[in-house]
Curated annotation (Swiss-Prot):
GO BP, sorted A to Z: amphisome-lysosome fusion; autophagosome-lysosome fusion; cytoplasm to vacuole targeting by the Cvt pathway; intracellular protein transport; macroautophagy; piecemeal microautophagy of the nucleus; vacuolar calcium ion homeostasis; vacuole fusion, non-autophagic
Other noteworthy facts: Present with 2360 molecules/cell in log phase SD medium.
Name of the protein in its database record: Vacuolar morphogenesis protein 7
InterPro entries membership: PX_dom, PX_dom_sf, T_SNARE_dom
Pfam families: PX (PF00787)
Cited CDD domains: PX_SNARE (cd06897), SNARE_VAM7 (cd15858)
The organism of origin for this protein: Saccharomyces cerevisiae (strain ATCC 204508 / S288c) (Baker's yeast)
Length: 316
């Protein structure tokens, strides 16, 4: 797919590492995107990781299949070992998908290094303008319908809620809800906009319900000959301006986004801690392996020394 400056992708970039080519001295891993297939050596993935960390100035938070350690060499696992190749293939695919589809942290994929690695092309200017035009038209159409609904919910000239207007508004709201569900299925809107529109629909539907409730209470009061007292919650809803409603919905969306960002930071911190612990464990394992090798060497030397001592005693 043509990437919208990769860091601003509205759709998930599906990446597969689904093929390998084994050469006499190295292995090529086939990377597939919706419009490209590239073959990369493991060393190229490693170079991508290290260069990103150097340019961004931080440890990359995504899991990466590490180079063979002391244990792999001890077990004589070669570069063309089938099990190692499959482990790397799965790990590299996971690494690329996390790197290019992180919704919260786009620093890594926005770099020129990351874009060049998968040869992500710039969007065609005419296509980009066409997409922007469609998005603008959709937003204008939505805003016009919302404006009509709010006009339907305005009070009558005598100050009483418009029941007929509420019925008309409810019909339009149901149409807007169906339209929003279709947009969600098509993934044509960003998640923040979907959240904002859904919250606005819920608010307007509640306003319709409040008008109906107030009308029933008023009719009951007339039948009983008693003037009904104003319902405080209805007054509050009716007294709100269009600007108040929009500001309330925008604040709700901002609060939700802040909570998600805070949660993401906690998860990233935990992942970074886990990576550090894993590195420490690997270091400890290497030290233990080296110690085991030293013990084995010392044991062999002692055996040789004992043989020489016995031979010397026998000859004496």
């Amino acid at each position: 797919m043509a990437a919208n400056s990769v860091g601003k992708m509205s759709e998930k970039l599906r990446i597969k590492v689904d093929d390998v080519k084994i050469n006499p001295k190295y292995v090529l891993y086939g990377v597939s995107t919706p419009n490209k297939r590239l073959y990369k050596r493991y060393s190229e993935f490693w170079k991508l990781k290290t260069r990103l960390e150097r340019d961004v100035g931080s440890t990359i938070p995504y899991d990466f299949p590490e180079k063979p350690g002391v244990l792999d060499r001890r077990w004589q696992r070669r570069y063309d070992d089938p099990e190692m190749i499959d482990e790397r293939r799965i790990g590299l695919e996971r690494f690329l998908n996390e790197l290019y589809n992180d919704r919260f942290d786009s620093r890594w994929r926005d770099t020129k290094i990351a874009q060049d690695f998968l040869q992500l092309s710039k969007p065609n200017v005419s296509q980009e303008k066409s997409q922007q035009h469609l998005e603008t038209a959709d937003e204008v159409g939505w805003d016009e319908m919302i404006r009509d609904i709010k006009l339907d919910l305005d009070k009558e000239s005598d100050g009483t809620p418009s029941v007929r207007g509420a019925l008309r508004a409810r019909t339009k709201l149901h149409k807007l809800r169906e339209r929003l569900e279709q947009d969600v299925q098509k993934k044509s809107l960003p998640s923040t906009e979907v959240t904002r529109r859904a919250a606005l629909l819920r608010s307007l539907l509640k306003e319709c319900d409040d008008i109906g409730t107030a009308n029933i209470a008023q009719d009951r009061g007339r039948l009983l000959g008693v003037a009904t007292s104003d319902n405080s919650s209805t007054t509050e809803v009716q007294g709100r301006t269009n600007n108040d409603l929009q500001q309330g919905q925008m604040q709700m969306v901002r609060d939700q986004e802040q909570e998600l960002v805070a949660l993401h930071r906690i998860i990233q911190a935990q992942r970074g801690l886990a990576l550090e612990m894993n590195e420490e464990l690997q270091t400890q394992n290497e030290l233990l392996t080296a110690l085991e090798d030293d013990v084995d060497n010392t044991g062999r030397r002692l055996q040789i020394a004992n043989k020489k001592a016995r031979h010397f005693n026998n000859s004496a």
